[in-house]
Amino acid sequence: MFRYEAKVFKELVDSVSKILDEGLFIITGEGLRLRGMDPARVALVDIEIPSSSFFDFYMAGDVERVELGVNMETLKGVVARAKKGDQLEVRVREDKVLFIVESVVLRRYLLPNLEVIVDVPEDISLEFDATATVIADVVKKTLRDVELVGDIVEFDAGEDYLSIRSVGPERRRVETRLTRESPALIDLEVKEPATSRYDVGYLKRMLGVAKIAESIELSFSTDKPLKMVFKSPDGSRVTYLLAPSTG
């Protein structure tokens, strides 16, 4: 079915397992895709890995679509020890899925192919007033700083700046402000100024994906959902939608 870099797959699974209890991977000739929402329906994750990103990728015979349903915590355990250079091979056999981790030793895991129901709108159309592309490591470190101060992070964008900040009790405050001259701010497009607040905990759940992404695209409007797009050098793409905080 396919062979992929085990370490990269591990980072994806680690993050997604904090959002979804079960995942349904859809495999077609174009590649692999997983979409799902958390039980509270606050966050949506969408993973797309094109067939060209795999070491090996094939569809058997005239099969056009294969569904792979799995418990995310179980899958997390399968790839838990994956290191850089390891490879993951996946073979789907109707009601079973064989995972082979090729490392110093060869590890095989045979798991049931679960029937997973995905209740996610097929097409979510959103327009955003502000879109900023930022170096991934800067976003990751900024959110970790924010967590030290409060539970809510505020994104604020103007014509020539992006601010990520939080205000906590006892006048604690932290802010990362990027301008168009900042090396970390790759691109900034602002139709009109926008400010919106989000739960830090939900954002932290996807920080693992930042390890495999060079940049993160942040899109938002005032009091509207936040869209984060993580782009990997191999062509993989992770989109994360998060509802604004009402607190």
Curated annotation (Swiss-Prot):
Pfam families per the UniProt record, alphabetical: PCNA_C (PF02747), PCNA_N (PF00705)
Domain of life, per lineage: Archaea
GO biological process terms, semicolon-separated: leading strand elongation; regulation of DNA replication
Molecular-function GO term, any one: DNA binding
Swiss-Prot/TrEMBL keywords: DNA replication, DNA-binding
InterPro entries for this protein: DNA_clamp_sf, Pr_cel_nuc_antig, Pr_cel_nuc_antig_C, Pr_cel_nuc_antig_CS, Pr_cel_nuc_antig_N
Keyword DNA-binding carried by entry: yes
Gene3D superfamilies (alphabetical): 3.70.10.10
UniProt function note: Sliding clamp subunit that acts as a moving platform for DNA processing. Responsible for tethering the catalytic subunit of DNA polymerase and other proteins to DNA during high-speed replication.
Similarity comment: family membership: Belongs to the PCNA family.
Assembly and oligomerization: Heterotrimer. The subunits circularize to form a toroid; DNA passes through its center. Replication factor C (RFC) is required to load the toroid on the DNA.
PANTHER family assigned: PROLIFERATING CELL NUCLEAR ANTIGEN
Protein name: DNA polymerase sliding clamp 1
Native source organism of the sequence: Aeropyrum pernix (strain ATCC 700893 / DSM 11879 / JCM 9820 / NBRC 100138 / K1)
Top-level taxonomy: Archaea, Thermoproteota, Thermoprotei, Desulfurococcales, Desulfurococcaceae
